[in-house]
Curated annotation (Swiss-Prot):
It comes from Bradyrhizobium sp. (strain BTAi1 / ATCC BAA-1182). The lineage of its organism: Bacteria, Pseudomonadati, Pseudomonadota, Alphaproteobacteria, Hyphomicrobiales. One of its GO terms (biological process) is peptidoglycan biosynthetic process. It comes from the Bacteria. Cell wall formation. This is UDP-N-acetylenolpyruvoylglucosamine reductase. Its main location: cytoplasm.
Amino acid sequence: MSFADITPDLKAAMPELRGRLLANEGLAPLTWFRVGGPAQVLFTPADADDLAYFLKHLPAELPVYVIGVGSNLIVRDGGVPGVVIRLAPRAFGEVKVDGDIVAAGTAALDKRVAEVAASANLTGLEFLFGIPGTIGGALRMNAGANGGETKDILVEATAIDRQGVTHHFTNADMNFTYRASGADPSLIFTAARFRGKPSDAEAIRGRMAEVQAHRETAQPIREKTGGSTFKNPPGHSAWRLVDAAGCRGLKVGGAQVSEMHCNFLINTGNATADDIETLGETVRERVEATSGIALQWEIKRIGLKAR
């Protein structure tokens, strides 16, 4: 499927734009599942000022979606109408340390932020080492693993709104809850500051090694997957509910519930986005039928289904 090419109109309305605009650009290569249709417009801003300029001049009726490394994302097969903004590491991926503060652009990999903190002998950020995403996603969903969450370490987040205005948010402003933040969904996060605590370098590295060992042995990290599919309901583990419903190894087309970890869906090689989403919905139905619990998606789904 392809969309009307609106990039000439956008370029004409934004003569000072420095970033890259592409029409009908495939998104599958930008996601871990490797599925999905194109973006009507894919915009890669040159820097935060360029992003603000773009948003200020973008027609209000055009929907906007933001992606990082696509690790927690299903792009539907019909593609994404409107604008998809991809924050590239070269412009939004810097990580630096000042005292006990770790400052990171939102395209920085969570793992990289943990490594930089460890190099500065700062503890508290080790949990990020086991999260296969970027800081932007961590802010949006209060990403967490291995006993830590983004809310535990955030000092301040910087974001740009649809009018191109920059805002700064404290930890309290973010209104974090389990795997979510209360920040306006239209905000695009560009940077964050985290606080660590001075500690022993060897101990920090040891904890990071434990995190990596757990991922290697318990999660299908070599597969085409989107990470944890469903949020853990209060008092329950999603994977246990999925397993109890008899869904371990369940398949729909080229999509399968991982045999290694039941809360991971994988693309076995030829899955469509619809295969993966249908499998997820089938799992939700079976879990609710057996336990009475309605699982909530943790993976973000965007775009249109194929016609």
